[in-house]
Amino acid sequence: MTMAHAAAARPVLRPLRADDLPAVLAIQRAAYGDGYQESAAVLGRKLALAPQACWLAQSDGGVVGYVFAHPWGDAGAPPLHAPLQALPARAAHGFVHDLAVSPAARGLGVAAALFGRVRDWSDGAGHRGMRLVALADALPFWVRQGFAVVPGALPPGYGEGACLMERAVRD
């Protein structure tokens, strides 16, 4: 999809389904390269545990972005490239595991729309805030969404410059 073509249609958000995983993996590879490519099994497990927090963005029938989120406790960040075994019994936060937009659709508001959907889910679930791990080049976007850096170590695999961020629920 060309930039002009992607700009012509406003993205439509819908719940993510298991049969969307091949398209999700293609966007993940285009967005991050091979270094952060997670398997369909890892992403499918997150989808199975928290389907209400996983969304897909489409434009003109093509997939242009996605977000995987899930309830999470106070313990930093979940490991990358490892399937979640279970969700915490008491979820203090909504955790944005991955939000990616196809390169052709960047700058069109897709990321903000996807984040808005999971923010509404997390706020509605009564979480006291949201957390995520931001890659260095995404930090400005997350700061604009109200996130601040939380000092501390991350599990291996998140890469140089990645940091844990948190956003408190707004009244």
Task: State where each predicted segment sits.
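Helix-loop element at the rim of GNAT/NAT acetyltransferase active sites that forms part
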Residues: 15, 26-39
